[in-house]
């Protein structure tokens, strides 16, 4: 983790430069992220399903100076005037690997001045029309979001404990999350990755989703948390090999990106030792919005959850909305 900031800084003309990452989930994605934001530069995780034209648009739009990617994502970008670093998992002699990029640099964290309101990330999110929109987030915005998640998670756990229910503590050496969604999305990067850094939770990373492989990883790695779209936990429940594995380590079956059918909530709670949860957020809010879990979610399976501080719920009946297009 300490070498990427040094090597990234040495390749930069300014600490505020923009660096882009596009690869499937792998540990070097995380190393690159920490190296970029650790020097006060802007990290731009791009959709790994994009094709060359879409990648080129985003790179030119955000004026990226350096690109970390795997072989498949770097393909077709030969004419793009940008420094390209390839993941060590997909070596190619045409590019410098991440291992080579960091080898000659110190393990000491560089001394750089970073303001709380300096930009840290740009996540591209599709709009209703036109090209994807780049969403800027600051160092303060991301850190405050992670602490807000920690706060509400602690409150929910304490409530379950008072009610005599089994609960998932925020910290502990036994905690492990199955990172089963893309790191280029705020659910993967914030809820799974960055929260794990804060609380010291083990990350069990999947390159891509496969319900059968997920069951095996939960069994082998004693996974306690899983957060993804509701379909993923539903696939675990209905997989033909489910009963071949010990899934009793699971404590949280998190979901987001869409509602769960009420009947699914009930069946998940009845068939897993872990309890289902749900959340709602936006790229623009670093995934922060609402959360629900435990008995409250079981009793109100159609809910999107309670508003998480510092998010404020606003009633549209008290708003005067514009009547003309701006």
Question: Predicted segment positions?
Answer:
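Single conserved hydrophobic/aromatic residue that forms the stacking wall/gate
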Residues: 1, 5-15, 19, 318-326
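Gly/Ser/Thr-rich phosphate-binding loop
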Residues: 127, 198-199, 220-228, 237-299, ...
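Conserved AMP-binding A3 loop
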Residues: 120-151, 156-158, 324
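Conserved AMP-binding/adenylation subdomain of ANL enzymes
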Residues: 143-179, 184-224, 239
């Amino acid at each position: 983790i300490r070498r990427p900031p040094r090597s990234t800084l040495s390749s930069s003309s300014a600490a505020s430069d923009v660096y882009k990452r596009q690869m499937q989930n792998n540990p070097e994605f995380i190393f690159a992220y920490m190296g970029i934001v650790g020097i006060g530069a802007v990290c731009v995780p791009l959709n790994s399903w994009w094709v060359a034209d879409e990648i080129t648009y985003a790179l030119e739009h955000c004026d990226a100076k350096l690109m970390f990617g795997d072989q498949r994502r770097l393909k077709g970008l030969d004419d793009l005037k940008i420094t390209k670093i390839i993941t060590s998992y997909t070596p190619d002699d045409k590019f410098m690997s991440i291992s080579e990029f960091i080898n000659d640099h110190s393990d000491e964290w560089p001394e750089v001045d970073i303001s709380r309101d300096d930009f840290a990330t740009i996540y591209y999110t599709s709009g209703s029309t036109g090209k994807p929109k780049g969403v800027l987030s600051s160092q303060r915005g991301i850190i405050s979001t992670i602490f807000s998640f920690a706060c509400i998670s602690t409150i929910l756990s304490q409530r379950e404990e008072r009610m005599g229910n089994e609960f998932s503590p925020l910290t502990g050496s036994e905690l492990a999350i199955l990172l089963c969604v893309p790191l280029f999305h705020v659910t993967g990067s914030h809820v799974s990755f960055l929260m794990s850094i804060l609380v010291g939770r083990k990350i069990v990373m999947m390159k891509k989703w496969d319900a059968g492989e997920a069951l095996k990883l939960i069994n082998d790695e004693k996974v306690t948390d899983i957060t993804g779209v509701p379909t993923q936990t539903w696939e675990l429940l209905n997989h033909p090999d489910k009963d071949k594995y010990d899934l009793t380590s699971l404590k949280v079956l998190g979901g987001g990106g869409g509602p769960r059918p009420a009947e699914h909530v009930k069946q998940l709670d009845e068939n897993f030792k872990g309890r289902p949860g749900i959340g709602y957020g936006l790229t623009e809010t670093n995934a922060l919005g609402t959360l629900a879990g435990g008995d409250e979610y079981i009793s109100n399976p159609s809910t999107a959850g309670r508003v998480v501080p510092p998010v404020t719920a606003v009633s549209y009946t008290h708003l005067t909305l514009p009547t003309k297009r701006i």
